[in-house]
Amino acid sequence: MNTLSAISNNKQSKELQILNINFNQDQGCFAVGHEYGFLVYNTNPIDIRVKRNFNINGHGSGIAHITMLHRTNYLALVGGGKNPKFANNKLVIWDDLKRKNSLNLEFMSPVLNVLLSRIRIIVVLKNQVLVYGFSSPPKKFATYETIENEFGLADLSVNFTNSIGNNLSTSNSSISSLVSNQVSYDSNKYQTLAFPGRSIGQIQIVDVSPSGQEKNLVSIIKAHKSKIRCLALNRSGTLVASASETGTIIRVHSTHNTALLYEFRRGLDRAIVTSMKFSHDDSKLAVLSDKNTLHVYNVSPLNTSSGATSDLVTHNETYPVNRSHLLGSIAFPIPIPKYFKSTWSFCSVNTNKYHPSGSDNDTINDVGIIGWSGNDSIIIIWQNKKIWEKYVIVEKRNKYLGDINDGLNTSHQGSSNWELVRFNWKNLDNLD
């Protein structure tokens, strides 16, 4: 056994600097780009599936962005870090079965984000979003101008009639067979793409399915007064959630008619919303901010269009109900601040109680990425702490009329309160 090599590899693992984390389309896997290559994990239970080290030959190795294509052997890679594997203005579609590049696209500016489906490659630049066909060579279908989008914000809905893929380690499909084998794909199904508009606070909605590209229609949602900081589509592409750089309000709009369906309050203080995800059944929205607080909102169709809880009608008394302020239901002779009429999450947790931030800047400014496992379990991957966590929504009976400790009214007598409990956690360094 080469002892020096083993020690070196172990030291490299402990010092691993993560550059990017992304869940795949069904959130059953997630990929990690780092200074030496990339890793792919099964989400729950967490288990390492693929480990690629590009640092062996001494050449460039850093991967600053990675996107999986379901569970196939194709991944989108962009170089970065101290010693990049590829230039940051170059997108590589990596065939992990053959361990080589399958497609390459180069641009005049850095690639900030990449979204994949079996028929589309979406490339996000600072002021543009480009739509390509997933073919060899890739054919460009459309270019959309955006406001300065330094965080590469964009999201693509998941068409699950088109999501059947091979295991990452066993797939033998080529690019041509991947695209041509569309027996289960319905070209009339929407494949919604959301990204910032040309003006502050706007979101553009485009259908990038074959039928949608023929129509080439763009819907504009005026979502916020401030610049968009985070956005997310539900699986079916019918809802888009967004937060501005202020971070106090979460709004959910219809992508079909741009109507505002829900308006939720995250908090009173400014915060950066770092991640948002809808649950698999589109009934819940999880939101994580730089304050390390995880909120979950009910966006079930049973809710009213305004998102208010007081008008909720349901025959299931254990169904999660978003909270409202006690003063919001009282009639006052004069108008009261909008804050007291806000709708709040039905459960939340400050994750700092499980892992205090400490004094290290890397952990204080840590970024968590959200994924769902089922409809009641939320996975958070912390980039700097390199921690995987599983939080579960659990029910707790409330004997009283409401919880008045924080001034929020959960619901009526006999209904249920909900809480987020950390069920498990693991350190990514210990999984190699």
Swiss-Prot record:
Family matches, as InterPro entries: PROPPIN, WD40/YVTN_repeat-like_dom_sf, WD40_repeat_dom_sf, WD40_rpt
Main location class: membrane
Location in or out of the cell: Vacuole membrane; Cytoplasmic vesicle membrane
WD repeats by residue range: 223-263, 268-307
Protein's membrane topology: Peripheral membrane protein
Keyword set, alphabetical order: Cytoplasmic vesicle, Membrane, Protein transport, Repeat, Transport, Vacuole, WD repeat
GO biological process: piecemeal microautophagy of the nucleus; protein transport
GO molecular function annotations of the record: phosphatidylinositol-3,5-bisphosphate binding; phosphatidylinositol-3-phosphate binding; phosphatidylinositol-4-phosphate binding; phosphatidylinositol-5-phosphate binding
Domain-level remarks: May contain a beta-propeller domain involved in specific binding to phosphatidylinositol 3,5-bisphosphate (PIP2), leading to the association of the protein to the membrane.
Role: Involved in mitochondrial or peroxisomal functions and amino acid signaling pathways.
Family: Belongs to the WD repeat PROPPIN family.
Name listed for the protein in its UniProt record: SVP1-like protein 2
